[in-house]
Swiss-Prot record:
Protein name, per record: CTP synthase
Binding sites annotated in the UniProt record for L-glutamine: 54, 351, 379-382, 402, 459
Keyword Phosphoprotein: no
Residue ranges of every copy of the Glutamine amidotransferase type-1 domain listed in the record: 290-532
Binding of UTP, residues: 13, 186-191, 222
InterPro entries listed in its UniProt record: Class_I_gatase-like (IPR029062), CTP_synthase (IPR004468), CTP_synthase_N (IPR017456), GATASE (IPR017926), GATase1_CTP_Synthase (IPR033828), P-loop_NTPase (IPR027417)
Regulation: Allosterically activated by GTP, when glutamine is the substrate; GTP has no effect on the reaction when ammonia is the substrate. The allosteric effector GTP functions by stabilizing the protein conformation that binds the tetrahedral intermediate(s) formed during glutamine hydrolysis. Inhibited by the product CTP, via allosteric rather than competitive inhibition.
Length: 533
């Protein structure tokens, strides 16, 4: 029988519930329990696929094609696992399912209500996933008191009643500010947040107190007294340099040990040696390389969270810290490529729409002509093709039909199966697809095998009618779709130091102990450029 750990948040959003949940899941897995994480997003969207990155950060793509909240990326990285679309529960999904059942007549004429029909649907989905696991960590998005979260908190309360207190625990993540005027940590916001939670019938078993500095003992005792939580279950979670330190901090504070005991699970020492070594290696790095990310959402770096993490993983693997230079693509259009001077590598990531397109291609040309290590991803792959068509093949006005439907040279075109679709949500080429890599190429050297599976999120592709012209001019398409060899997946320029682009998103499968090969190669090339071979 599975044990459930619900993680809730209070006071303010953006405290790091996702990292706390990922860390707790990782610590339970490190103890030998078969563990998974679920994210509940209380918005009415069915999934994250059509959301603006400036509002919610990147859209993370799963193997099964699910477009989900970026927290699931943290879960996958921390637990070194692959999740499914079912691991992301949204209000949109729940209400859609309940309305569909009502239309089908499943409720036999009953008045359909939030309680019990919505809450039952929520519990059913959580239990369905739990069947294969010992421990399930469920993060409830939003902040206690939000009207959107109410049905999910009620479902969690009911689950403790139905499963038994020994099988359900609650961890509440809250904020302890330190006012400069008085110079002490204030616990009142936490007290009120827990009071709100208790008014909903939920008594937290542990409190993770987020603060800038370690929690003062007086604050710990005060929180314990006013929230009815033992002092040892009031966990200090202060700011650290890197998120990968958080599991080690929470382990030192005893969170997983306390929850293990609270749920009646056997006490075990966690296997954390490899993780600890990875964190220590990262903290000890002194040499630095600078990689420019030229994008259209750079004002919110979480729009490219998985790319940031993949660079971090690759930095540790190559013995260098990676400093990111965030470059707004439109600024390149206004001020020129001088914004890229001095960088050791350039990434042009995915994105949609015309804004910043010319700036991205200016960055691609700058990398190509100055032999700067380069990686293009998804739309960056397509724009690399457009830039090459214009400036090497001399095809004036070449473009993607996404940006210019009337282009005389549609070197990037809508995939045939995408034509005629009238819905945006969930209709792209999504999820893991096979990619066949040609021998004697950089891609084969990086991946070390012929067949790989990588995650995709696109509607446009390289127009097969132009492939021969590109190849004659020296552009190598080193990877093709395993299910359709006319669909290009990887390109490279062999005469360059490191110049590669992928139609897929390699960042989504990068892990702290196993960096994505094309990122690892990019950082290696950047290091060699700066420090010599």
């Amino acid at each position: 029988m599975a044990k459930f750990i619900f993680v809730t948040g209070g006071v303010v959003s953006g405290l790091g519930k996702g990292i706390t949940s990922a860390s707790l899941g990782m610590l339970m897995k490190a103890r030998g329990f078969k563990t998974t994480n679920i994210k509940i997003d209380p918005y009415l969207n069915y999934d994250a696929g059509t959301m603006n990155p400036y509002q919610h950060g990147e859209v993370f793509v799963l193997d099964d094609g699910g477009e989900v909240d970026l927290d699931l990326g943290n879960y996958e990285r921390f637990l070194d696992t692959s999740l499914t679309f079912d691991h992301n529960i949204t209000t949109g999904k729940i209400y859609s399912a309940v309305i569909e059942k009502e239309r089908r007549g499943d409720y036999l004429g009953a008045t359909v209500q939030v309680i019990p029909h919505i809450t039952n649907e929520i519990k059913e989905r959580i239990r369905e996933i739990a069947r294969d696991y010992d421990v399930v960590v469920v993060e409830i998005g939003g902040t206690v008191g939000d009207i959107e979260s109410m049905p999910f908190l009620e479902a969690a309360r009911q689950m403790q009643l139905e499963e038994g207190r020994d099988n359900v625990a609650f961890v509440h993540v809250t904020y302890v500010p330190k006012l400069r005027v008085v110079g002490e940590q204030k616990t009142k916001p936490t007290q009120h947040s827990v009071k709100e939670l208790r008014s909903l019938g939920i008594q937290p078993d542990a409190i993770v107190a987020r603060s800038e500095d370690p929690l003062e003992e007086s604050a710990r005792r005060k929180i314990s007294l006013f929230t009815n939580v033992p002092p040892e279950a009031v966990i200090s979670a202060y700011d650290v340099e890197d998120t990968y330190e958080v599991p080690l901090m929470l382990e030192k504070e005893g969170l997983a040990r306390y929850i293990t005991k609270r749920l009646g699970l056997p006490e075990r020492e966690p296997e954390l040696d490899a993780w600890r070594e990875m964190v220590e290696r990262y903290k000890s790095l002194t040499d630095t390389v600078e990689i420019a990310i030229v994008g259209k959402y750079v004002k919110l770096s979480d729009s490219y969270l998985s790319i940031k993490e993949a660079l971090k993983h690759s930095g540790v693997a190559n013995g260098v810290k990676v400093k990111i230079r965030w470059v707004e693509a439109e600024d390149v259009e206004k001020h020129g490529v001088k914004l890229l001077e001095g960088v050791d590598g350039i990434i042009v990531p995915g994105g949609f729409g015309a804004r910043g397109t010319e700036g991205k291609m200016m960055a691609i040309r700058y990398a190509r002509e100055n032999d700067i290590p380069f990686l293009g991803i998804c739309f960056g792959f397509q724009l690399t093709v457009v830039e090459f068509a214009r400036n090497v093949l001399g095809l004036k006005g070449a473009h993607s039909t996404e940006i210019d439907p009337q282009t005389p040279y549609p070197v990037v075109d809508l995939m045939p199966e995408q034509r005629g679709l009238d819905k945006l949500g969930g209709t792209m080429r999504l999820g893991a697809y096979p990619v066949k890599i040609k021998p004697n190429t950089l891609a084969r050297e990086l991946y070390g095998r012929e067949l790989i599976y990588e995650r995709h999120r696109h509607r446009w592709e390289v127009n097969p009618e132009f492939i021969e012209r590109f190849e004659k001019a020296g552009l190598v398409f080193s990877g093709v779709a395993g299910d359709d060899e006319r669909r290009m997946e990887i390109l490279e320029l062999p005469e360059k130091r490191y110049f590669i682009a992928t139609q897929f998103h390699p960042e989504f499968k990068s892990r702290p102990m196993n960096p994505a090969p094309v990122f690892r190669g990019l950082v290696k090339a950047a290091k060699e450029k700066k420090f010599g071979d």
